[in-house]
Amino acid sequence: MSITVEEKNRVMTEFATKKGDTGSPEVQVAILSSRIATLTEHFKTHKKDNHSRRGLLKLVAQRRKLLDYLKGKDEARYNVLIAKLGLRR
């Protein structure tokens, strides 16, 4: 239910603000979004997996906190990120 190393590296290179960037809010939110998408697919076939559902809710809350932080620090970067990820339709 986790993402592969290749997928994680792809996301990091796509959203990195500079070379070797692994900790910026953009990268963290993108990785969390990838994990959330993976878990969402998992729940389409495993509807009663409540242990993993709790983990999904924790990931969503963590992503929300990072997005709130980014919006407070730099709203322009926040808007670019949510547009790139397709969040907040």
Swiss-Prot record:
**What does the UniProt keyword field contain?**
Ribonucleoprotein, Ribosomal protein, RNA-binding, rRNA-binding
Which CDD domains did the record assign? Ribosomal_S15p_S13e (cd00353)
The highest taxon in the source lineage is Bacteria
A GO BP term here is:
translation
Single annotated GO MF: rRNA binding
**What Gene Ontology terms describe where this protein resides (cellular component)?**
cytosolic small ribosomal subunit
Q: Function of this protein?
A: One of the primary rRNA binding proteins, it binds directly to 16S rRNA where it helps nucleate assembly of the platform of the 30S subunit by binding and bridging several RNA helices of the 16S rRNA.
UniProt cross-references to PANTHER family, sorted A to Z:
RIBOSOMAL PROTEIN S15, BACTERIAL AND ORGANELLAR (PTHR23321), SMALL RIBOSOMAL SUBUNIT PROTEIN US15M (PTHR23321:SF26)
The annotated subunit structure for this chain is: Part of the 30S ribosomal subunit. Forms a bridge to the 50S subunit in the 70S ribosome, contacting the 23S rRNA.
Q: Which family does the record claim for this protein? A: Belongs to the universal ribosomal protein uS15 family.
Q: What is this protein called?
A: Small ribosomal subunit protein uS15
Task: Give the gene symbol.
Answer: rpsO
